[in-house]
Regions:
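C-terminal transmembrane helical hairpin of 12-TM major facilitator-type secondary transporters
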Residues: 328-371
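Short amphipathic helix-loop junctions that connect adjacent transmembrane helices
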Residues: 43-76, 283-300
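Juxtamembrane intracellular "pre-TM" segments in multi-pass secondary transporters
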Residues: 9-28, 229-268, 456-457
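Helix-to-loop junctions at the C-terminal end of transmembrane segments
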Residues: 92-106, 313-327, 413
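C-terminal ends and interior cores of transmembrane alpha-helices
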Residues: 112-131, 336-350
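A membrane-interface helix-boundary motif in multi-pass transporters
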Residues: 69-75, 192-215, 411-430
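Hydrophobic core of transmembrane alpha-helices in multi-pass small-molecule transporters
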Residues: 121, 132-150, 354-369
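Glycine-rich segments within core transmembrane alpha-helices of 12-TM secondary carriers
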Residues: 171-193, 395-405
Length: 457
């Protein structure tokens, strides 16, 4: 082989390792996908879709009921049903997708396919007008499923573009970019919905804002699609048949092989508990703020934006702390803060804006950091060549059990009639997650997976 054919050699024949430069180029491109998809998460899934689709469904309701797949439901319950349906469907679809992604060289193409398909579904919501809530429902379900599929591929790329010792930094920076991008577009869209420029009605402003999130998601996905490298499959289990049959064969082999990675499984269970607690706090915070503490929509909007932008700095800070103390210790510290947050929420005074905003700052600090480090920490515990498969389990199990926290919140409220004990009850998820995480032997898990043990774990 000639020197010029080897990317690790200079033209003069001397050895020049170009891999760090390639990794840096890929990392910069990879960050943009978190920036891209967070617009959908914040503007559509978190803030605007639910009140918009409820309003549309109320027009179509007969005796305050609509028919969803033959089931009579109240319009106010429609967003919850749609999210639940898409979540359960994702839990079944993601594992075979992971096996397919591991066998695919063009992972950036697969990432872009799911992103652009998801953005197309999201754009359908723009056409949900009058009493046609069904097209909005299809848009959200398709968008959510494609978002989960793209997250599997995106997370699986993380171990391919970063070495073990640098993974926490890279993952945290990606999360930070996501919060910044999602926060910027959300601020613009909330201004549009509030100010109503160009004579827009509130409904039209919401439609335009959600369409902008779909366009944002699709447009910024071009950056990773064009600039990420290809990653040829490694350690692929030989299987007969076409790519789909091979993927299912590999998935079956991986399911049998899971028992060989007990440390990764223990962490997964820990993650399911504490992440469910995090997601439930986020999902219920608006309800808690409005129904229990008596805050107006304006205060809730300010708090949502505050959390978004504080989370940008929180994710970066957690990445730096992990470099010094190790991801596991920093995640555990974050869970202690989460327990303090739900405890403080129990005693938060009504209609006192400053304490509520202070709680939002605390949430922002630990929100992005704990999730970003969970992603990078898990990547150390999984074998090379099966990154997408294991991240598909990571996301599928998350979706399959994500109703535990909301069920707990709902049941405690039903029995007590107050949201204060309901929010405090979530402390159990952080405590159980932390106790299980304490049992994770990081060094052993990394060695079992065949990865290099970083100097700081």
């Amino acid at each position: 082989m000639s020197d010029s054919a080897d990317p690790g050699r200079s033209v003069s024949g001397g050895i020049a390792d170009l891999r760090p430069l390639t990794r840096m180029k890929n990392q910069k491109a990879w960050y943009w996908y978190d920036w891209a998809n967070s617009a959908y998460v914040t503007t559509i899934a978190t803030v605007l879709f639910a009140p918009y689709i409820i309003n549309i469904a109320e027009r179509a309701a007969v005796d305050d009921r609509i028919s969803l797949l033959g089931i009579s439901v109240a319009p106010g319950s429609l967003p919850s049903y749609l999210v639940t349906f898409s979540t359960i469907l994702s839990a079944f679809l993601l594992p075979p997708l992971g096996a397919l992604a591991d066998r695919t060289k063009n992972k950036k193409g697969l990432l872009a396919f799911f992103a652009w398909t998801g953005a197309a579904f999201a754009a359908l919501i723009f056409f949900a007008t009058g009493d046609n809530w069904q097209i909005g429902a299809i848009g959200l379900i398709g968008g959510n499923i494609c978002l989960g599929a793209s997250a599997v591929v995106n997370d699986a790329i993380l171990p391919l573009i970063s070495e073990e010792h640098d993974r926490d930094r890279v993952s945290s920076r990606g999360w930070a970019w996501g919060y910044l991008g999602g926060g910027i577009l959300l601020a613009i869209n909330l201004a549009v919905v509030t100010v109503l420029p160009f004579g827009l009605s509130t409904e039209s402003a919401a439609r335009v804002s959600m369409l902008s999130a779909a366009v944002w998601w699709a447009a910024f996905t071009f950056i990773p699609y064009l600039k990420l490298s290809d990653f040829p499959p490694v350690h692929v289990v030989p299987e007969s048949g076409g790519i789909i049959r091979q993927s299912f064969g590999q998935l079956a082999d991986t399911l049998k092989d899971l028992r060989n990675y007990p440390v990764a499984l223990t962490f997964l269970v820990a993650y399911l508990f504490f992440n469910d607690g995090i997601q439930t706090v986020i999902a219920s915070s608006s309800t808690y703020g409005s129904e229990q503490l008596g805050f107006s929509d304006d205060v809730l909007i300010i708090t949502i934006l505050l959390v978004q932008f504080v989370a940008f700095f929180g994710a970066l800070t957690f990445g730096r702390l992990a470099k010094v103390y190790g991801a596991k210790r920093v995640i555990l510290a974050g869970l202690v803060v989460w327990m303090a947050i739900v405890t403080a929420a129990l005693f938060l005074p009504e209609e006192k804006m400053i304490p509520f905003l202070a709680l939002g700052v605390a949430i922002g600090i630990v929100l992005g950091g704990t999730q970003a480090l969970a992603r990078s920490y898990f990547s150390l515990l999984i074998p090379r060549g099966k990154e997408a498969e294991y991240f598909s389990f990571y996301h599928a199990m998350d979706r399959g059990t994500s109703w535990f926290g909301t069920l707990t919140f709902g049941l405690v409220y039903q029995f007590t009639g107050s949201y204060r004990p309901a929010i405090f009850a979530l402390i159990a998820f952080f405590a159980l997650g932390g106790l299980l995480l304490l049992r994770v032997d990081t060094a052993k898990g990394i060695r079992d997976a065949g990865n290099d043990v970083p100097a700081v774990i």
